Every structure is written in structure tokens, then in C-alpha cells.
């Protein structure tokens, strides 16, 4: 098999986005659009990927580190000029080169593989990826002769009335014989209104040299959707989300209302898990089998075990074991590690907390910088007081401990195994194993005193 190369065009400034963020770094379902493109290319056994960068080059290189080589286009002088910047890396090499736009996040590896195969079958020097759309206004048209052979690409503004009625368009993705590409690029002129060097002119140069130019027509226009403004970004995100959600449903996940469920592309979900409407699953979240995530929940970069029930709660950068009940309205902040068979109830917040197997935090609890053992019960209103205004400190609770309601554990403090903390206590010293910790003022009843108080009656 001949060598394969790819050039990704990612140097455009994207002024229509009206954003400080470099255009191709705008995310589509949790991943920058240019990274979608490069990740798809990486599955094609490509020998080298060269990304042409311009504005925001450093940020693009950060995101694609290890996935691509980079060449900077100092001046944005058109698509042909952009590809020519890869001359030092690719010119003179045998093989074929894919040219793909970095702002087409929906393009799939299977389509590019089909393009490469068609290019090889036709023994072409260039093959254009095309598609047919109802309204081709603004797109370059593919002009074929009576035998269906490609004659040229005509830009919309230069097309005759007859040519404007053609619905087959140039998607901006190409496959070239690598040597022929770079030889032709040297002859591209900028004799046009914009004074730029355009890649479609390579097609004309090759045709004028009697080289074979082919066109592979793909089924779906959506793969070629280029993102140039926020409206197109929203459309691309919508189409990508539908693709992601349908893939999860095909793999055994129930999405009660897919249209209102947001799932990033790197999220993994196990079979027979049910995701209710209004759920957001972000980053590299992994959810096991047989879970339920109810409406209003957000889970970000977290690992969730099997048979977990998350009720209208937020989980960030945390780990949850099997058979755990969470919520409603719980908040697991980063570095929470919740073991199996734990109950995290309503209005419970954890942060940098390890919660041992079988432990119950039923409601209105804060546990930050805490290590909690197995089979512990923490009463309503209890707090691990971890911050003294300058420093954070740790609370350690052993196994089989009972913490009464409205208890304050002033860190650093350790509560031993099987200890009992009396309700309303403020614990400032360690509590030994099997001990009762109690720290509250003695109750004093003032008999008859209430008669002197004004109760408003």
C-alpha cells in the first residue's frame, strides 16, 4: 500500500466567530473541532499528519501534541498557499495526501477511507470529495462532461446560470497524488480579486496536463459542514450530539429524550443504564451498567460504577463505586472517592473525601478533606470543619462510627473505630476507639422564666 499523508488546514483566523478563542479550537461536544478531524484521520494508518496553523498556533499545538506535526502559515494567502507550507515535510515523497479543513468536525474516517479507495481505483492524480445539497448557493460546483468525468470546479460567483443549477458541490476535502500536488502548487496563481492562492486551481492545472481527476460523491452533506460562525457551530454541535446519542442507544443505553440529553464525545456508558432528560455528561466520564441518572444531573470527568442511582446531583472529577445512591441535590466536588454501597443523600457536599463502603451521609452534610471508614452514619447537619482561614486540615473517621446530628469535627481530628459522637458536639480533640465524644454546654432549665418573655401573645 502506498504511503499516506494528511494536511489539515487550520490557519484561518475565524473573524466571523467574533471570539478571542482561535476558531478551530471551539469545542463541539467536548472536543475542539480540529481535534475531531485529526482523531478521525489518525485511524486511517496515515504515515504523517501535518497541521497548518496560523493565528493561535501555540494553543492548537497544545491540543494536538503527539497527534500531528505543525507548520505555520505566517500570512493567510489562501488554501493553496496553506498546503504549500508543508512542502519541506512532504514534497517529493511517493504516496497520496489527504487535504482536510480543520473546521469540519463532522467528517468521518469511513468517508475519508472511501475517498482514498476511490482515488486508488480511478488511478487519479486528484480526487474531490463531493456531495449533493438542495441549496448549493455559495458553494463551488462540480462540472462534469456527458460521460460524468470531472471537468472543473466553478466557484458560485463565477458560475453561469446553468452551472448554478448544479447541486453537486465541492466539500473542500481532497485526495492527491503527493508529488503531483506539490508540483502543481508551484504553478497556482493569485490572479484573482482576493489576490490569494486557491486549492481548486490545482484541479485545473492537473486537468490541463491531461491528468486523471475524479470526484467521489458522499451521501451525507452534514459531514462537510464547515464552521465559520456561532450559528454553524451550534448546528455542528447538534448534529454531533445526535450522532453520539444514537451510538449510545445502539449500544444498549436508554436515553429517555435524546434531544434534551447532552453527552460529550469521550463519555462511555454501560448497557441498560437509563439517562433522563436534561442530563449533562461531560469530559471523559465513564458510567457503568444498570445505572439511572435523573433529570438535572451533571457529571464531569468522573467514573461511576454499576447500579448507581444519581438523582438530580452534580459530580465533578470524582470516583463512585457500585450500588451507590446519590442525591437529590448532592454535590461531589473534585477528588471525592465514594466506595460501594454508600448513600449520599440530599444536600450533601463532599470534597477530597474518601467515603468507605456501606457508609451513610443522608442529608445536609459537608465532608471536605475527610477520610471516612466503613459503615459510618453521619447525622444531619454535620460538618468536617477543614479550613481555619489559612490552611486546610484533615478529618479522619474510623469504621462503624456514629456521628450525631449537628456535629462539628474541627480538623485536624481523628475519630476512632466504633466511636460515638453525641449530637450537637463540637469535637476539637481526637476520640479514641469505642469512646463517646461529647462537647456541648450543659442544659440549664430556668423554671418559670418564660413568663417574663414576650412571645407576641
From Swiss-Prot:
Pfam families: Hexapep, NTP_transferase. It comes from Listeria monocytogenes serotype 4a (strain HCC23). Binds 1 Mg(2+) ion per subunit. Mg(2+) binds at residues 103, 228. Residues 252-457 are annotated as: N-acetyltransferase. Acetyl-CoA binds at residues 386-387, 423, 440. Its main location: cytoplasm. Pathway: Nucleotide-sugar biosynthesis; UDP-N-acetyl-alpha-D-glucosamine biosynthesis; N-acetyl-alpha-D-glucosamine 1-phosphate from alpha-D-glucosamine 6-phosphate (route II): step 2/2; Nucleotide-sugar biosynthesis; UDP-N-acetyl-alpha-D-glucosamine biosynthesis; UDP-N-acetyl-alpha-D-glucosamine from N-acetyl-alpha-D-glucosamine 1-phosphate: step 1/1; Bacterial outer membrane biogenesis; LPS lipid A biosynthesis. Its EC number is 2.7.7.23, 2.3.1.157. Its cofactor is Mg(2+). InterPro entries: Bifunctional_GlmU, GlmU-like, GlmU_C_LbH, Hexapep, Hexapep_transf_CS, NTP_transferase_dom, Nucleotide-diphossugar_trans, Trimer_LpxA-like_sf. Residues 231-251 are annotated as: Linker. GO terms for molecular function: glucosamine-1-phosphate N-acetyltransferase activity; magnesium ion binding; UDP-N-acetylglucosamine diphosphorylase activity. Homotrimer. Catalyzes the last two sequential reactions in the de novo biosynthetic pathway for UDP-N-acetylglucosamine (UDP-GlcNAc). The C-terminal domain catalyzes the transfer of acetyl group from acetyl coenzyme A to glucosamine-1-phosphate (GlcN-1-P) to produce N-acetylglucosamine-1-phosphate (GlcNAc-1-P), which is converted into UDP-GlcNAc by the transfer of uridine 5-monophosphate (from uridine 5-triphosphate), a reaction catalyzed by the N-terminal domain. Residues 1-230 are annotated as: Pyrophosphorylase. This is Bifunctional protein GlmU. Keywords: Acyltransferase, Cell shape, Cell wall biogenesis/degradation, Cytoplasm, Magnesium, Metal-binding, Multifunctional enzyme, Nucleotidyltransferase, Peptidoglycan synthesis, Repeat, Transferase. GO terms for cellular component: cytoplasm; membrane. The active site is at residue 363. In the N-terminal section; belongs to the N-acetylglucosamine-1-phosphate uridyltransferase family. In the C-terminal section; belongs to the transferase hexapeptide repeat family. It is an enzyme of class 2 (transferase). PROSITE patterns: HEXAPEP_TRANSFERASES (PS00101). HAMAP family: GlmU. It is found in: Cytoplasm. It catalyses: alpha-D-glucosamine 1-phosphate + acetyl-CoA = N-acetyl-alpha-D-glucosamine 1-phosphate + CoA + H(+); N-acetyl-alpha-D-glucosamine 1-phosphate + UTP + H(+) = UDP-N-acetyl-alpha-D-glucosamine + diphosphate. UDP-N-acetyl-alpha-D-glucosamine binds at residues 9-12, 23, 73, 78-79, 140, 155, 170, 228, 333, 351, 366, 377.
